[in-house]
Amino acid sequence: MENSFKAALKAGRPQIGLWLGLSSSYSAELLAGAGFDWLLIDGEHAPNNVQTVLTQLQAIAPYPSQPVVRPSWNDPVQIKQLLDVGTQTLLVPMVQNADEAREAVRATRYPPAGIRGVGSALARASRWNRIPDYLQKANDQMCVLVQIETREAMKNLPQILDVEGVDGVFIGPADLSADMGYAGNPQHPEVQAAIEQAIVQIRESGKAPGILIANEQLAKRYLELGALFVAVGVDTTLLARAAEALAARFGAQATAVKPGVY
């Protein structure tokens, strides 16, 4: 039951991750053995639901890689279901201010600390009430990562960092660059300056900074600045580009692909 991902962040040990968008338990298990510290199961932009998240959690469970789940929104009903199927670490998208960060934390806590509904007899998370004192232990093992993706969220970062129960803050470079007027160009100097400043600010607050970036030089730069959970690739991108490269080596004419954010 111990959340080893949360423990690693608290100890200041950088965690390298991979984004999962294929929504497949088979590919999730394949990648769980690849050596990444954590795997992000994406419920915001990938075609996932509670059932597909569950099967991926089950597939990853025997491996050292730790699952992180991103719901589609900061929704306590959806979060409750994801926690009951066994999610312990959440990446909550589009958090704009401290109140929204507090709502995310409260959704992960049983009363009186929060509003999570008690249904442990039905829940994989408690192993159907086979984990002794699950209801007393669960709150402390929840890891809440909130995602800042706009100029407004950046402005409110100091207040977000003050919210008790927020373990880390993840910078979303794609949406942030779009909000700053540089859609598709997170490497623009102004965007990079904002990202770097935020990483330093988050780390100095005692929280864990995180980001997704497929550029290896930038990933290493962010780690040097103090980022503690960094996703360095996306399964869909890795599969698509590798397949195109293989076909091209045998003379196939692939559709030209404009380099993406990830």
UniProtKB/Swiss-Prot annotation:
The record marks 70 as: Transition state stabilizer. Its EC number is 4.1.2.52. Its cofactor is Co(2+); Mn(2+); Zn(2+); Fe(2+). Keywords: Aromatic hydrocarbons catabolism, Cobalt, Iron, Lyase, Magnesium, Manganese, Metal-binding, Zinc. Pathway: Aromatic compound metabolism; 4-hydroxyphenylacetate degradation; pyruvate and succinate semialdehyde from 4-hydroxyphenylacetate: step 7/7. A divalent metal cation binds at residues 149, 175. Binds 1 divalent metal cation per subunit. Has the highest activity with Co(2+) and Mn(2+), but can also use Zn(2+), Fe(2+) and Mg(2+). GO terms for biological process: 4-hydroxyphenylacetate catabolic process; phenylacetate catabolic process. The record marks 84 as: Increases basicity of active site His. One of its GO terms (molecular function) is metal ion binding. It is an enzyme of class 4 (lyase). Changing residue 70 to A: Loss of activity. Still able to bind pyruvate. Substrate binds at residues 147, 174-175. It catalyses: 4-hydroxy-2-oxoheptanedioate = succinate semialdehyde + pyruvate. The active site is at residue 45. The aldol addition reaction proceeds via a rapid equilibrium random order mechanism. Homohexamer; trimer of dimers. NCBIfam families: HpaI. Belongs to the HpcH/HpaI aldolase family. Catalyzes the reversible retro-aldol cleavage of 4-hydroxy-2-ketoheptane-1,7-dioate (HKHD) to pyruvate and succinate semialdehyde. Is also able to catalyze the aldol cleavage of 4-hydroxy-2-ketopentanoate and 4-hydroxy-2-ketohexanoate. Is not stereospecific since it can cleave both substrate enantiomers. Also exhibits significant oxaloacetate decarboxylase activity in vitro. In the reverse direction, is able to condense a range of aldehyde acceptors (from two to five carbons in length) with pyruvate or 2-oxobutanoate. This is 4-hydroxy-2-oxo-heptane-1,7-dioate aldolase. It comes from Escherichia coli.
